[in-house]
Amino acid sequence: MNLSSNFTGLCIRAWHCPMHRMSEHKSYQLTHLEQLEAESIFIMREVAAQFGKPALLFSGGKDSIVMVRLAQKAFWPSKLPFPLVHVDTGHNFGETIVFRDHLAKEVDAELIIGSVQAEIDAGRAREETGPNPSRNRLQIPALLNAIEQHKFDACLGGARRDEEKARAKERFFSHRDSFGQWDPKNQRPELWNLFNGRMDFGEHFRIFPISNWTEMDVWQYIKMEDISLPSIYFSHEREFVRRDGVLLGRCEHITLLEGEQWECANVRCRTVGDMTCTGMVESVANNVDDIIEEVAAARQTERGGRADDKRGETAMEDRKKEGYF
C-alpha cells in the first residue's frame, strides 16, 4: 500500500517489506549499522518477553519512525505487538501529524493519541504565559495519563545518548516509579545483555532500544532502508523568526517580540517537536545524501536548536524526573 500523493508535506516512498535486505547478504560479517540494528531488535524482543502491555511512543520524528521499522523487523511477519502512542500538544507541525496518521495506517498499527488540550481543559495542566509560552512540559501529564489509562507497563522510546547529557546517562531499561518519575541516582546496572524489568504495582519502564545510535547512524540507516520521512526534515522555504539564536518557524502560536521580524530562507528541521520550541537550521539539503554530508560537517549539536533545552542547564533532566519522555 503506497502513501497517497494527494497529501502535501510527505516524502513519498512505499513502506516495503522490512526484511528486504535478507537476500542481499553475502557475508556473515555485520556492518556497524547491522550490529546496531541487531542490538535494538534484541531489546524490543526482550520487552515483548518481559512485559505484559508495552507501547511505542511515537512523535512523528525520524527516531520514532526508525523505531517503527525496527519493530517491524523484530516481529515480522506478525503485526506490531503494541500500539503507537502519540502525545498531541496542538502545536505540532502539520506535516508531522499527516505523516503520523498515514504511517500508522500503512503498518496497520493501533494509534493512541493523548491530548495536551484535554489535560488543560480538565485542569490537570496549566497553559504557560509570557513571551515564550510552550506546551512541551505539558506533555508530561498527558503522557502519564495515557500510560495510567491504558495500563502500559513499558513504553519504548527513540531517545539516544548522543542527543543530550541527561539522556547520555540513562539506561536502556529506565525505571519509573508509581508517579512516573525518574531517579537518575537510582538506576539499575545493565551487564552485557541482561536487563532487569522487575517492578512493583503501578510502576513502569521506559525502554530506549536505539540508545547507542548517533544522529549519523540514524540517517545512514534511513538511507540503507529507504525510509520515508516528513518533508520538514528536508530543505524547504519557510518564514521564521530568530530568537535567542534559535530559528522558530512562523505559526499562529508565536508572537513577535519588540524588534523581531519574520525572515524567509531555505531551512529544515534536524529534530522535531512543537513549533514553539523546535529550532530550524538554514540548509539546502533536500535529500538524504546531502543531509548525511551536512551532519558530518555540523558544528552544532542536534538539539542545539531546541528552545526547550535552553531554559536551563538541567532542563531536560528536570523534565525527565517529572515523567517526560
Predicted segments with their positions:
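Short, positively charged and aromatic/hydrophobic N-terminal segments
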Residues: 6-18
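Nucleotide-activated chemistry modules centered on ATP-dependent adenylation/adenylyltransferase
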Residues: 16-325
